[in-house]
């Protein structure tokens, strides 16, 4: 896992998926949600329990796109249930999403 580059992995059942959080992942998310990039702040603040899984989902798709490989079939609701059922996992992924968006998570100067 290389969180500083927005690279991590997530286990969904018996499968492990690579996640790549970069501008393209956010572009894919915005295109899917039919929203402008500037609306991400509103999305994260209004519904963080959906925002984090949504970013992770598009990070999974982005990781495959950048390698030129077919996208995996990921059931969004199943993935969200796994992420939201484990507070530690949710916090870890939230921090990774925040870092990919340029948030320092209270770690200024480090």
Segments and roles (model prediction):
Residues 51-62:
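Short, hydrophobic/amphipathic alpha-helical patches that form generic packing surfaces
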Residues 1-11, 16, 34-46, 50, ...:
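Charged interaction scaffolds used for protein-protein
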């Amino acid at each position: 896992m290389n969180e500083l580059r927005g690279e991590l992995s997530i286990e969904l059942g018996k499968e492990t998926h690579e996640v790549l959080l970069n501008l393209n992942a956010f572009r894919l998310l915005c295109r899917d949600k039919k929203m402008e990039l500037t609306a991400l702040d509103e999305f994260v603040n209004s519904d963080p329990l959906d925002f984090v899984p949504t970013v992770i989902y598009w990070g999974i798709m982005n990781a495959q796109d950048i390698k030129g490989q077919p996208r995996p079939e990921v059931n969004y609701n199943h993935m969200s249930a796994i992420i939201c059922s484990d507070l530690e996992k949710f916090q870890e992924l939230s921090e990774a999403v925040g870092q990919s968006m340029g948030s320092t998570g209270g770690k200024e100067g480090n």
